[in-house]
Amino acid sequence: MEEIFPGVYKENGNLYTKDENLEPWNPFVSKPAAAILKGLKNFPLRKGMKILYLGAAHGTTVAHFSNILGEGIIYAVEFSSKVIQKLLEKAKNKENIVPLLEDARFPENYGWIGKIDLIYEDIAQRDQILILKRNSVFLKKDGYFMLALKAKAIDSVRDVKEIYSEALKELSKNFEILETINLEPYEKDHLFILGKNSKH
């Protein structure tokens, strides 16, 4: 078994993170796992980081991030009071997860979370880019973001490549784009974007 990034392991084409035991990281469920298997060169999560996770859902990917971070902290934002219940269950066993029942479009409502090392966003809404920009007020200079961009949530009719191109152009106004990965066959019409807050 090879440790391909700190806290991320690969064996026979499968990914794992480690809590007390190795936990399989499914690329068909978790977009960062898909991006890694598609050849992502840089995966900036490190032990001790503070992460703002937008669109935490049931907490599957949050739990893997938790394994990697160790004594770091994840502020896990989820808007649905129904969906967040599973996340709350996971957080009981993982001290570094802080669930926030909030709307990611309004980061001013989170309360004090301080400066963040990395923002991860997986929110299938038309204003995905704007949500990232609004939340970047918490991002440290030279902090990272990872965005799982869902093209059809932005526009269900237009050409996907056109949507990607416009999104990257818009993001480039505020951030340095480091890598882009098309997530097919794991996710249709998704572009995984890694960037850095080096323009502030």
Language-model regions, residue ranges each:
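N-terminal auxiliary segments of SAM/dcSAM-dependent transferases
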Residues: M1-W25
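Conserved alpha-helix/loop element of class I SAM-dependent methyltransferases that forms part
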Residues: E2, P27-K50
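Residue-level signature of catalytic and energy-coupling elements of molecular machines
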Residues: I36, G55, I119, G195
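Helix-to-beta-strand junctions that scaffold the AdoMet/dcAdoMet cofactor pocket
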Residues: R46, L69-G70, F138-D142
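Conserved class I S-adenosyl-L-methionine
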Residues: R46-A57, I73-Y75
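Conserved SAM-binding loop of SAM-dependent methyltransferases across substrates and taxa
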Residues: A57-E71
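S-adenosyl-L-methionine
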Residues: V77-D127
